[in-house]
From Swiss-Prot:
Cellular component, GO, one term: peroxisomal membrane
Transmembrane segments: 466-483
Protein name: Fatty acyl-CoA reductase 1
Subcellular location: Peroxisome membrane
Topological region Cytoplasmic: 1-465
Catalytic reactions of this protein: a long-chain fatty acyl-CoA + 2 NADPH + 2 H(+) = a long-chain primary fatty alcohol + 2 NADP(+) + CoA; hexadecanoyl-CoA + 2 NADPH + 2 H(+) = hexadecan-1-ol + 2 NADP(+) + CoA; octadecanoyl-CoA + 2 NADPH + 2 H(+) = octadecan-1-ol + 2 NADP(+) + CoA; (9Z)-octadecenoyl-CoA + 2 NADPH + 2 H(+) = (9Z)-octadecen-1-ol + 2 NADP(+) + CoA
Gene3D superfamilies cross-referenced by the UniProt entry: NAD(P)-binding Rossmann-like Domain
Alphabetically ordered keywords of this record: Lipid biosynthesis, Lipid metabolism, Membrane, NADP, Oxidoreductase, Peroxisome, Transmembrane, Transmembrane helix
Biological role: Catalyzes the reduction of saturated and unsaturated C16 or C18 fatty acyl-CoA to fatty alcohols. It plays an essential role in the production of ether lipids/plasmalogens which synthesis requires fatty alcohols. In parallel, it is also required for wax monoesters production since fatty alcohols also constitute a substrate for their synthesis.
UniProt cross-references to CDD domains, sorted A to Z: FAR-N_SDR_e (cd05236), FAR_C (cd09071)
Topological region Peroxisomal: 484-515
Lineage: Eukaryota, Metazoa, Chordata, Craniata, Vertebrata
Species, as recorded: Gallus gallus (Chicken)
């Protein structure tokens, strides 16, 4: 059987979502580890006044591509940028470009999607379902297409506790839903959204499930496969440890915790935090396309790309490693010392929100007003709470994913391919990974230099001293207000102090007797 790099040799690849987190990493890995790939066509839309070419130039000039740039200085020559809008008819492609793609493309990686949990149903359907349908329509016309790879999510069927590697029947016919959305106004769509998504937490998971069904039905005559990653996090090893470039998902929460802004969060300490490094997902995606291209399985292949079943990690452990990392290597200009309390209790959660989030933010904004600056902390806290609401469903529950196809795929790889395209999460050491992840948010998201660590540590010590001073003043005030004015309170106080003294005396005496 040919190796993975040999399979991609001379192939023309079509990639959507190249400007997204996973798409960037896939583009870099494909060009670096399969250097004889013929060309990678990337479908990109203009955005914020930038042309597609300018967007790709900016991406390929970032640190993520440093290793590739060193190994293959001319790699950009293989990237062919195509202006496209996936939600428009015919993908908004000109006829000559469309004919070129139909003639030459061998492999499609469909990574494009909206990952916003608060997307309206109309937009989520357009970006996740309609775009997939239209890309499949183009794929069906391609004369040399070997594989269509669709990137989904492990939470597409989060309304089930046990999720197999199959495409489940959809809650509604995607075609009928798309037809209905054409004549509904936004108000009506928003009104029916809760009933449509049912027991799913958001439109993202709902539309990703619909997109899988579209792939199964529309791609019935194609050689298709689906990858379902769970919570995609920073890179494990490639192109270097800790690469992350966005605030999405847990990354934003890690930063908020490191800054001392996030103090409490609704989560189950025992729930599995099914994080999966982005390079694991990319390696598995490239390997899955190789397997389908070489073996041409009779049925659609579905791969649950998760870690919880083979190398479980829990939210309590996430909290511990994030806080310990940021205490050793603090972020610059932290608001408070890092400390997070996870709770699944509704009343405790709202108590800590009021005491640890809103009260300090309110007082800090008063301080900013007094000093003539614009208040900002309450706005930050409000945004943080919105993000927490969207994530608490995933931090409070656990799922069981079947990963037999993932194991099968791993066993099909040659020893060399297992090294180059490693997705064996049993080898993942969580403590090391979490430290690299946190440091990645510091270096690549916040763009903080490691040379600033001494000043950041000094600032954290200053915050500690302020806290100790504040607590001391608080104790003195409580003493003056409550204890010093009440005979009963003084008697209770003296009793507690006497009891503690007797206990310590007994403990010292017992220790002396042992020796």
């Amino acid at each position: 059987m040919v190796s993975i790099p040999e399979y991609y040799e001379g192939k023309n690849v079509l990639l959507t979502g190249a400007t997204g987190f996973m798409g960037k990493v896939l583009l870099e890995k494909l060009l670096r580890s399969c250097p004889k790939v013929k060309a990678v066509y990337v479908l990109v839309r203009p955005k914020a006044g930038q042309t597609p070419e300018a967007r790709i130039e900016e991406i390929t000039s970032c640190k993520l591509f440093d290793r590739l740039r060193e190994e293959q200085p001319d790699f950009k020559e293989k990237i062919i940028v195509i202006t496209s809008e996936l939600t428009q008819p015919e993908l908004d492609l000109s006829n000559p470009v469309k004919e070129k793609l139909i003639e030459c493309i061998n492999i499609i990686f469909h990574c494009a999607a909206t990952v916003r949990f608060n997307e309206t149903l109309r937009d989520a359907v357009q970006l996740n379902v309609l775009s997939t349908k239209q890309l499949l329509s183009l794929a069906q016309q391609m004369t040399n297409l070997e594989v269509f790879m669709h990137v989904s999510t492990a939470y597409a069927y989060c309304n089930r506790k046990h999720i197999e590697e199959v495409v489940y029947p959809p809650p509604v016919d995607p075609k009928k839903l798309m037809d209905s959305l054409e004549w509904m106004d936004d108000s009506l769509v928003n009104d029916i959204t809760p009933k449509l998504i049912g027991d799913r937490p958001n439109t993202y998971t709902y539309t990703k499930a619909l997109a899988e069904y579209v792939v199964q039905q529309e791609g019935a005559r194609l050689n298709t496969a689906i990858i379902r990653p769970s919570i995609v996090g920073a890179s494990w090893k490639e192109p270097f440890p800790g690469w992350i470039d966005n605030f999405n998902g847990p990354s934003g929460l890690f930063i908020a915790a490191g800054k001392g802004i996030l103090r409490t969060m609704r989560a189950s300490n025992g729930a599995v935090a099914d994080l999966v490094p982005v390079d694991v997902v990319v390696n598995m995606t490239l390997a899955a396309a190789w397997y389908s291209g070489v073996n041409r399985p009779r049925n659609i292949m579905v791969y649950n790309c998760t870690t919880g079943g083979t190398n479980p990690f829990h939210w309590s452990e996430v909290e511990y490693h994030v806080i310990s990392t940021f205490k050793r290597n603090p972020l610059e200009q932290a608001f408070r010392r890092p400390n997070v309390n996870l709770t699944s209790n509704h009343l405790l959660y709202h108590y800590w929100i009021a005491v640890s989030h809103k009260a300090p933010a309110f007082l800090y904004d008063i301080y900013l007003r007094i000093t003539g600056r614009s208040p900002r902390m309450m706005k930050t806290i409000t945004r943080l709470h919105k993000a927490m609401v969207f994530l608490e469903y995933f931090t409070s529950n656990s799922w069981i994913w079947n990963t037999e196809n993932m194991t099968m795929l791993m066993n099909q790889l040659s020893p060399e391919d297992k090294k180059t395209f490693n997705f064996d999460v049993r080898q993942l050491h969580w403590a090391e990974y979490m430290e690299n992840y946190c440091m990645g948010t510091k270096k690549y998201v916040l763009n903080e230099e490691m040379s600033g660590l001494p000043a950041a540590r000094k600032h954290l010590n200053k915050l500690r001293n302020i806290r100790y001073g504040f607590n001391t003043i608080l104790v003195i005030l409580i003493w003056r207000i409550f204890i010093a004015r009440s005979q009963m309170a003084r008697n209770i106080w003296y009793f507690v102090v006497s009891l503690c003294y007797k206990f310590l005396s007994y403990f010292r005496a017992s220790s002396t007797m042992r020796y």
